[in-house]
Amino acid sequence: MKVILNFSPNFDPKKRNKSEIKFIVFHYTGMKSEKKAIDKLLDYNSKVSCHYLIKNNGDIIKMVPENYQAWHAGISSWKKFKSLNKNSIGIEITNPGHGFKYKKF
């Protein structure tokens, strides 16, 4: 396993304090292939990103530094927290999901 730096242009440019981070939001990509998922997360026009992407081989791509908000949680809430991008680290695992037949992970 290795960590690869490949930064996405999609994040909130305002820095946040580590104390603001309260959650980890774990998703699967839901894309047909790993390449398509990576391309989308790096595409400025997609307006989506994550802090970390776990590839099929176990390598990790760091896409957004933790002190910035990635755009992964959309309209979201948990208890008193709203817009979870503000308070979370987003981790994606490459998996086609229910739209393209789940793969074991």
Residue ranges and their predicted role:
Residues 2-105:
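Active-site-adjacent loop/helix surface patches within enzyme catalytic domains
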